[in-house]
Design a protein with these regions (language model features):
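N-terminal helical cap/lid subdomain that shapes the substrate entry/recognition surface
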Residues: 1-82
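Short beta->alpha linker loops
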Residues: 78-81, 102, 129, 152
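Short glycine/serine/threonine/alanine-rich loop segments
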Residues: 30, 93, 165
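Short amphipathic alpha-helical segments and helix-helix/interface helices
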Residues: 83-90, 97, 138-139, 157, ...
Length: 203
């Protein structure tokens, strides 16, 4: 069974987070490229604002939370590989999307807008407010089945501590492209497209 993270793995979310940061903070005058460079160096939004000589307004986090899954902002996300390639992979392999979202309805609408409506029944949506990690979900729901988790965040490497789970992380999504996993069964891949094109028997 293959599980794919969504944000950052199948879709590029930088434009959405850039727009949200600008709108929620009121900070303008930065390009998308500047935001990405600074965000990778300083993951905390407060530090990003400080890099521009500003502080975040008191209502920043309230605004950001209301914007994160607003369809108007979700519309900024772009597929990293064509919808046809994703759908074909899911059709030919046992797959699910495993994502963290507070609004499953908005997520379903986003899938449809991106041309992935055929995957609506192949999604597991975890609510981040429940504090359940993807590793916990896999441990509880697949105690013996062999699982492959494909993601883009260093934190997802913890799932590789489960004996039955292999983790593949897309290098372009890592904050540090040179980061080396400290656990076995965790591997770095160059692109999601290359992974989907690879011989699945070798995974």
């Amino acid at each position: 069974m293959f599980y794919f993270d969504f944000d950052g793995t199948l879709v590029d979310v930088w434009q959405r987070y850039y727009q949200i940061f600008k709108d929620a903070s009121g900070i303008s005058g930065m390009s998308l490229e500047e935001y990405i460079r600074i965000k990778k160096e300083f993951p905390r939004d407060a530090d990003v604002a400080r890099a521009f000589g500003r502080t975040l307004p008191e209502d920043y986090w309230t605004k950001k939370r209301s914007m994160l899954e607003n369809p108007a902002y979700l519309a900024h996300d772009r597929l990293i590989v064509p919808a046809e390639q994703i759908c074909e992979f899911f059709q030919n392999n046992p797959c699910r999307i495993l994502t963290n979202r507070r609004d499953p309805v908005a997520f379903s609408g986003q899938l449809t807008a991106l041309g992935l409506e055929s995957l609506l029944d192949a999604c597991v949506v975890l609510n981040p407010d429940d504090k359940k990690t993807k590793a916990q979900f896999l441990r509880e729901n697949h105690p013996v089945e062999q699982i492959v988790l494909v993601g883009d965040a260093e934190a997802e490497a913890q799932a590789a501590e489960i004996d039955t789970v292999k983790v593949f992380l897309v290098r372009t999504g890592l904050r540090d492209p040179q980061w080396i996993p400290g656990v076995e069964n965790c591997y770095i891949i160059e692109s999601i497209s290359d992974f989907m094109d690879a011989d699945k028997e070798s995974v």
